[in-house]
Amino acid sequence: MKKTLALIFLSLIILKAEEFKVSNTDEIKSVMKKVQPGDRVILANGEWKDAAIVFDADGTKEKPITLCAEISGKVILNGNSSLKIAGDYLIVDGLNFLGGYIEKGAVIEFRNGTKKESNHSRLTNTVIENYNHPDKTVDYKWVSLYGTHNRVDHCYFRNKAYQGCLLVVWLSDKPNYHLIDSNYFAYRPDLGNNGGEIIRVGTSDWSMYPSYTVVEKNYFEQCSGEREIISNKSVYNTYRYNTFVECQGALTLRHGNNCDVYGNYFFGNNVKGTGGVRIIGEGHKVYNNYFQDLEGEDAFSALSIMNGVPNSPLNRYFQVKNAVVAFNTFVNNRHSIEIGIGKNDELSLPPINCTIANNIVYSTKGKLVKNVDEPQNFKWEGNVFFGSELGIANPGGIEIKDPQMKKIHDLFIPQNSAIVQNKAAGNYDFIVEDIDGQKRDQLKTVGCDEMGVAKRIHLPMNKKNTGPFWLKHD
């Protein structure tokens, strides 16, 4: 009996997770040789200058390995510091990259070289701020996601002021299934050229491969590096429940097909060049979104649908086909809907076989719809437009009636229930809730918000409900 108890006790000692406190990269390297599932590697508080950290280990689903700050936010990485995360079931928590820069690659990379990528791993509660090269033409990323099933959440990314996308999902021959959520992206100045995206999912070369990445519940404030705030370049991705404030650009479905964009808020606050969603490609669905006070036009319109290039190569513009734009609300935008943008001798294919249904469009600023090129075989139904001139000959499916928009808690809500409540046309079974997460049944309300008193599940994101838990914003 005593022998059995001794063996059990010994097993518990062996299985008990350990904590390793480290003060430099040599100590981290040494710990990586003996770290086991469930262990924690704790970085000592203070300045870590020119620290090239390699977190190369393998945890398990039940027992991930964690690399964390002694106190969240108190480990300051600067100079030429960087981090590579390589292995399965790893967590990085509470780091603060502040005021340094690197020469190439990425500040945080979910791989170690090209041989070992990271899977089922997480970057959380971390800051990268002002990590800018003195030469603004030098291109490196802040976060590069490789592998599969990784998550970046509750991080703060501020003031990337040089060339290169901030966060990139890199594709391979198998889907990624990454999750990017609850982050605060802030203050990206206009670069004056391409390469200033906040998030890019894929590349032109891989744009017809599936990624299944989800970007949700993030807050984007004054992210204006270029015309594409988010650049989709792959297939089967979802962009939902994000909030964009004073961003001079658009969530752009640049390459790839069959993506969903729903439950997002776009607030322009009447700032020049602020935009919403731009559609390129096939099979996209844009629904349950709210667009307010956006001042952009053309590719920066609240909703723009592009022309395409015949026999387009992967890096140009594929014709828009079979898109659905439904149950959105547009309020006080300078250019609410523009169709066929970019039309010229090369971009000669107008959008075809698309549906515009059950949207509320209200504005007194400019024409509600602009056809730069004439769309082909569009289906319009159940829409309520009011305010300015329609801008096109009514194709049917647009009622010119006042929805009586009233501002309630920073959002404009229709008060004329007689023309919107239970008045949606058509059968859109894939839409089962509204922008708030309230249930939609067969008798749906026009616009993004279902009339009723049910609890609101999804609210606009802001600087207080995104980003690191330890970082307080006024």
Where are these regions (language model features)?
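Extracellular beta-strand repeat scaffolds in secreted/surface proteins
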Residues: D39-L43, N383-S388, T445-C448
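Right-handed parallel beta-helix/beta-solenoid
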Residues: K16-S30, P37, N45-E47, I71, ...
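Beta-solenoid repeat scaffold
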Residues: F20, P37-N45, K49-I76, L83-G94, ...
